[in-house]
């Protein structure tokens, strides 16, 4: 267990919350697509190159086993550690299974906002909020796995805040 509750207080009072539960399926399918060529390559290499060696069969067992473990375990762990929070002046994104990242984006730094949906997002009812900031390092901040309506709502909140800051 990671010790985090369903809602956790973030920076400046932001209530950190999980993204859509269906995002786990998006992650699972993306990992499956990533690992499938590696499994095929391992099977081919094992039969072609290792056929006459004592290591024959090792790649045919090890790589698919690792792929199954990654596809089964990683999506849940990534999901549990992906949170976002919103206050009246900032967006906070907390993520990281192996490497923890806590990103805080003040609305006044936002320059461009997008809501994107790929085929898997459409299939599972998720969207990604993309915030382009004025910074040079980490100038693009993403919040994947949001419900499409929630992503549009956050985009509109940030856009309205940007508009009022310049008036």
Question: Where in this protein do the model-derived segments appear?
Answer:
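N-terminal basic, Ser/Thr-rich segments that initiate or prime the first beta/alpha elements at protein or domain
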Residues: 1-108, 112-167
């Amino acid at each position: 267990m990671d010790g985090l509750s369903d809602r956790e207080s973030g920076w400046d009072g932001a209530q950190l919350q999980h993204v859509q539960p269906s995002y786990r399926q998006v992650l699972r399918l993306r990992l499956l697509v990533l690992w499938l060529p590696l499994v095929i390559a391992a099977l081919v290499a094992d039969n072609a190159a290792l056929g006459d060696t004592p290591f024959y069969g090792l790649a045919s067992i090890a790589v698919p086993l690792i792929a199954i473990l990654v596809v089964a375990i990683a999506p849940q762990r990534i999901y549990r550690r992906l949170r976002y929070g919103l206050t009246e002046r900032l967006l906070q994104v907390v993520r990281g299974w192996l490497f923890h990242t806590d990103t805080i984006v003040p609305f006044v730094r936002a320059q461009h906002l997008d809501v994107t949906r790929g085929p898997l997002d459409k299939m599972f009812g998720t969207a990604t909020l993309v915030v382009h900031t004025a910074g040079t390092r980490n100038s693009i901040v993403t919040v994947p796995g949001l419900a499409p309506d929630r992503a549009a709502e956050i985009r509109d909140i940030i856009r309205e805040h940007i508009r009022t800051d310049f008036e």
